[in-house]
């Protein structure tokens, strides 16, 4: 925590207004030093000159009620969570050795939406994982629709040497992987459009990040709506 605080204060001194917390499994932060992610964000919240903190990606099993509740109350931590889903099939999640199922994921999303109705929620989804039947893929599509995220990051499974998955039965044909990827990308576009439309006519503070070739400035609201 101390090292991260030093870095955050240093970027605040040079005028940074938003800090994005990123890393591999950031929800596991501090375990080796008897610290935790909640303790970190509470400390960061005290730095006066940083206006916004954004949590880049956090596993649903590590996104505790305490973290969600703290973000909901904070004036600095923005209402934006990117939460990996990977699949809406519990069988596939177990095969992927994920530490969560759809019930826990649903619980996390419900908690966020109850406390932060305008929160931007993004999801990672993998298509074409070995054993992903048509039925399993349909479960994923229906689960995503039920959760109503703001956007998806869609990844197409590809074989990697020296992994357990490459030796698994139930390989999904490449053409079917591409079809499923297209379906989810189209769904993501619909979800994003719906989220943006929901935020129309809202008064929000925008942090402008730069300008485009036509001279228009662009930036993002706290809940990650791009504004020009």
Sequence positions of predicted segments:
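Conserved SAM/AdoMet-binding glycine-rich loop
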Residues: 13-134
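Short, small-residue-rich loop/turn micro-motifs
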Residues: 23-25, 85-89, 156-161, 221-223
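C-terminal, non-catalytic macromolecule-binding modules
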Residues: 115, 135, 139-178
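Radical SAM enzyme [4Fe-4S]-AdoMet core and its adjacent flexible, acidic
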Residues: 30-49, 96-99, 159-190
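Canonical Radical SAM [4Fe-4S] cluster-binding loop centered on the CxxxCxxC motif
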Residues: 1-2
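Terminal RNA-binding accessory module
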Residues: 167-228
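Hydrophobic, well-ordered secondary-structure elements that form the walls
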Residues: 83, 124, 144, 152, ...
């Amino acid at each position: 925590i101390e090292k991260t605080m030093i870095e955050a204060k240093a970027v605040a001194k040079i005028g940074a207004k938003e800090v994005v917390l990123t890393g591999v499994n950031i929800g596991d932060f501090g375990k080796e030093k008897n610290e935790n992610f909640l303790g970190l964000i509470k400390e960061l919240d005290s730095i006066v000159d940083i206006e916004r903190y954004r949590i880049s990606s956090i596993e649903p099993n590590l996104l505790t009620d305490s973290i969600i509740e703290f973000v909901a109350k904070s004036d600095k931590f923005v209402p934006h969570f990117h939460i990996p889903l990977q699949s809406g099939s519990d069988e596939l999640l177990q095969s992927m050795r994920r530490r969560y199922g759809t019930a826990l994921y649903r619980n996390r999303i419900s908690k966020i939406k109850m406390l932060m109705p305008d929160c931007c929620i993004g999801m990672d989804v993998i298509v074409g994982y070995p054993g992903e039947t048509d039925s399993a893929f349909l479960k994923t599509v229906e689960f995503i629709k039920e959760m109503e995220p703001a956007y998806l990051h869609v990844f197409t499974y590809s074989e990697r040497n020296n992994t357990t998955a490459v030796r698994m039965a139930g390989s999904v044909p490449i053409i079917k992987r591409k079809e499923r990827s297209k379906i989810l990308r189209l769904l993501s576009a619909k979800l994003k459009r719906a989220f943006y439309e929901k935020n129309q006519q809202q008064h929000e503070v925008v942090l402008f990040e730069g300008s485009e070739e036509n001279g228009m400035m662009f930036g993002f609201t706290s809940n990650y709506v791009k504004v020009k």
